């Protein structure tokens, strides 16, 4: 089967936005106008095509990036293939956004014309900046009360520190919003608001003529800056033709020198078709962006893979989803080469082979089986056993590891238990499935309490995990309060000589151990034997190590696991008949309990590396608040038009921080935190913790 669409006619893009900027409605309209959807699903009715998980429909927010393939005939009559990835707009799902940005070639940033640039827009914009994703801006909801296009454009500069290139002006606003002025063609486009109606093209209204001339002048000035020859011609008084202007705008957009700004209202069906034309005109195809970098597995040298069907196959798994009909689906972006159903691929990250079963083209939640896929495609693969998010799949003869995605460590933990015994096994299966889908979600078992602990990026993140468990896996669970993972250690050296004796009837038990316990730098446990002359026979020494390790999980102060302990067995004694591995295990356990107390046990707490990105106005408040949380400020730096505050703060003092920061900065500052190291707890705080856990 040959390629149906040339790679230069592909557009892989996503729509990124603040939580209520109208992203799902916009995606629905795009799917409708590109002919895939016959009935538009309105988000406020809970019936949208892209939001295919129940919770998304209930909450009216988009959680999972569903990838959709659709087609659009541009102004030139050529059909283009669009692969659209819907991205979430809530701060707890930024991991989803990172994943989709990683595999996109371009993006549309939606703004609410009333609110302009909102906090989550800033966060997502920064993430897109990290991956240098070319972006256009669409000022949506122009029909809303308080809609202000010019203020939104100003905020793109002041809040995002980005260069806005205005390519359309609105005709009217709020209830009087009729359409747009196309500044390239210098024509007015108006819509009557009915679904699917084409634009009526006419002359620019007389009251907008002057403004349109002024903005076209600015547009040309910014566009010619990206090309030396065009700049020289312009300075000599030669204006670019409309065709040249489009290619200059495309060049500047692809090189991320500026961002074209359009406007409209998706809900009222005004401005959607010109946006689709702009995707074709201005956003890159897979061959317009730099080739993806990777590591050649054989030589360990850096290499690149060109977006070509003739290059060796390489693809990146960026999402795993559970599909009720197909089972587990792995979404992949093919960067180079082509792939047939049924072939064997290598997962170079896991060092495992994968056989390719079904290959699907996804349309939101319907699917189409395909035999072959090509460079630039986004496909869903069924039946992969080993592959998880961020893994590379490639030609086994030309192995490569593409750039890995980086996922932050989870920062919040809660205990979870099934409501009934019958749910115990189902809960384990459900949690493991969900953890395979989402690398920012972890599951572990607490050895002391036997409880299952789940960890994630925030409270909403874990709420939704629990909710999905109930809906998709029919598991009801009780959820505890968020907890801090404390640890214990020792501060000085202690030598313990302990004898374990049991000789009352039957087989006796005897073991004597002399052990030195001392602190060491690392977090692990080190065991060493310095026995000479057979004071403890060789076969019993592993029993000593096993005995100490078995009680390292529960320290003497509050029962937390111990870190950074070294134990050296220096002497001992045994009995020919009564000694055994078990007897030495018991003796070592008791010796450790004595030793931990005598070696000055102390409580340790997790210290988080916190980064707050805030507008300058709130820097003082942010620093003051972090200090009040026992935080150590390690520095501040400018990033664009914002300030980054770096600090080390105990996790125990960070609960509820998101709400404090939100209210302190009117929702404009964001923070990320990840575990850095353990540190001794101040004595006053340690006493409270011991009381609580004793």
UniProtKB/Swiss-Prot annotation:
Q: Which Pfam families match?
A: EFG_C (PF00679), EFG_III (PF14492), EFG_IV (PF03764), GTP_EFTU (PF00009), GTP_EFTU_D2 (PF03144)
What keywords were assigned to this record?
Answer: Cytoplasm, Elongation factor, GTP-binding, Nucleotide-binding, Protein biosynthesis
Q: Which GO terms describe its biological process?
A: ribosome disassembly
- Asked if GTP-binding is a keyword of the record, the answer is yes
| InterPro entries, A to Z | EFG_II, EFG_III, EFG_III/V, EFG_IV, EFG_V, EFG_V-like, EFTu-like_2, G_TR_CS
Q: Name one GO cellular component term.
A: cytoplasm
Sequence positions that bind GTP: 17-24, 86-90, 140-143
Instruction: Name all tr-type G domain ranges.
Output: 8-287
The molecular function GO annotations come to: GTP binding; GTPase activity; guanosine tetraphosphate binding; translation elongation factor activity
Q: Which SUPFAM superfamilies match?
A: EF-G C-terminal domain-like, P-loop containing nucleoside triphosphate hydrolases, Ribosomal protein S5 domain 2-like, Translation proteins
Protein's cellular compartments: Cytoplasm
Q: Which domain of life is it from?
A: Bacteria
Q: Which family does it belong to?
A: Belongs to the TRAFAC class translation factor GTPase superfamily. Classic translation factor GTPase family. EF-G/EF-2 subfamily.
Its function, per the record, reads: Catalyzes the GTP-dependent ribosomal translocation step during translation elongation. During this step, the ribosome changes from the pre-translocational (PRE) to the post-translocational (POST) state as the newly formed A-site-bound peptidyl-tRNA and P-site-bound deacylated tRNA move to the P and E sites, respectively. Catalyzes the coordinated movement of the two tRNA molecules, the mRNA and conformational changes in the ribosome.
Q: Which PANTHER family match?
A: RIBOSOME-RELEASING FACTOR 2, MITOCHONDRIAL, TRANSLATION ELONGATION FACTOR G-RELATED
Q: Which NCBIfam families match?
A: EF-G, PRK12740.1-5, small_GTP
Q: Which HAMAP family match?
A: EF_G_EF_2_B
The protein here is known as: Elongation factor G
Per the record, the gene is: fusA
């Amino acid at each position: 089967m040959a390629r149906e669409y040339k790679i230069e006619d592909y557009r892989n893009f996503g729509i990124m936005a603040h939580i209520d900027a109208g992203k799902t409605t916009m995606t629905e309209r795009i799917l409708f106008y590109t002919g895939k959807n016959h009935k538009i699903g309105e988000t406020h009715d809970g019936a949208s095509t892209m939001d295919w998980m129940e919770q998304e429909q209930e909450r009216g927010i988009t959680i999972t990036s569903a990838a959709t393939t659709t087609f659009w005939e541009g102004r030139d009559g050529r059909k283009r293939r669009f692969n659209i990835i819907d991205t979430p707009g809530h701060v707890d799902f930024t991991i989803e956004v990172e994943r989709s940005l990683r595999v996109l070639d371009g993006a549309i940033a939606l703004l609410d014309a009333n609110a302009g640039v909102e906090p989550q827009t800033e966060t997502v914009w920064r993430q897109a900046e990290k991956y240098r994703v070319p972006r256009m801006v669409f000022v949506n909801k122009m029909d809303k009360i308080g809609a202000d296009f010019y203020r939104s454009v100003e905020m793109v500069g002041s809040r995002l520190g980005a260069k806005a290139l205005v390519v359309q002006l609105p005709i009217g606003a709020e209830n009087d919003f009729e359409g747009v002025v196309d500044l390239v063609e210098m024509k007015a486009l108006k819509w009557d608001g009915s679904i699917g109606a084409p634009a009526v093209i006419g002359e620019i209204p007389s009251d907008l003529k002057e403004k349109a001339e002024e903005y076209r002048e600015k547009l040309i000035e910014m566009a010619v800056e990206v090309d030396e020859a065009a700049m020289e011609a312009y300075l000599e008084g030669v204006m670019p033709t409309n065709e040249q202007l489009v290619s200059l705008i495309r060049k500047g957009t692809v090189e991320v020198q500026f961002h074209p700004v359009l406007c409209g209202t998706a809900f009222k069906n005004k401005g959607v078709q010109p946006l689709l034309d702009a995707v074709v005109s201005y956003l890159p195809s897979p061959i317009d962006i730099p080739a993806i970098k990777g590591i050649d597995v054989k030589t360990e040298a850096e290499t690149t893979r060109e977006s070509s069907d003739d290059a060796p196959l390489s693809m990146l798994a960026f999402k795993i989803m559970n599909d009720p009909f197909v089972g587990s689906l792995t979404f992949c972006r093919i960067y180079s080469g082509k792939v047939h159903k049924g072939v064997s691929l290598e997962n170079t990250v896991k060092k495992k082979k994968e056989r390719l079963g079904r290959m699907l083209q996804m349309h939101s939640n319907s699917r189409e089986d395909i035999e072959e896929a090509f460079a630039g495609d986004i496909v869903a693969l069924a039946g992969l056993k080993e592959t998880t998010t961020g893994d590379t799949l490639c030609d086994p003869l030309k192995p490569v590891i593409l750039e890995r995605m980086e996922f932050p460590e989870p920062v919040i933990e809660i205990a979870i238990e099934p409501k009934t015994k019958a749910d115990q096994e189902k809960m384990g299966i459900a949690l493991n499935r969900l953890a395979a889908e989402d690398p920012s979600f972890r599951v572990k078992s607490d050895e002391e309490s036997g409880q299952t602990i789940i960890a994630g990026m925030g409270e909403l993140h874990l709420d939704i995990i629990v909710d999905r468990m109930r809906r998709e896996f029919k598991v009801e669970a009780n959820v505890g309060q968020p907890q801090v993972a404390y640890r214990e250690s020792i501060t000085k050296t202690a030598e313990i000589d302990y004898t374990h004796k049991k000789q009352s009837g039957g087989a006796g038990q005897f073991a004597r151990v002399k052990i030195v316990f001392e602190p060491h730098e690392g977090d692990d446990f080190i065991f060493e034997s310095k026995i000479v002359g057979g004071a403890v026979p060789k076969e019993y020494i592993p029993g000593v190590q096993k005995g100490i390790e078995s009680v390292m999980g529960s320290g003497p102060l509050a029962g937390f696991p111990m870190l950074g302990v070294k134990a050296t067995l220096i002497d001992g004694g045994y009995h020919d008949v009564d000694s055994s591995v078990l007897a030495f295990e018991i003796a070592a356990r008791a010796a450790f309990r004595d030793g931990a107390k005598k070696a000055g046990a102390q409580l340790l707490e997790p210290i988080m590396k916190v980064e707050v990105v805030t507008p300058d106005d709130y820097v003082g408040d942010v620093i003051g608040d972090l200090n009040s949380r026992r935080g150590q400020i390690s520095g501040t730096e400018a990033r664009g038009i914002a300030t980054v505050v770096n600090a080390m703060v105990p996790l125990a003092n960070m609960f509820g921080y998101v709400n404090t920061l939100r209210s302190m900065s009117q929702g404009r500052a964001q923070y990320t935190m990840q575990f850095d190291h353990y540190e001794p707890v101040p004595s006053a705080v340690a006493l409270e913790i011991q009381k609580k856990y004793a």
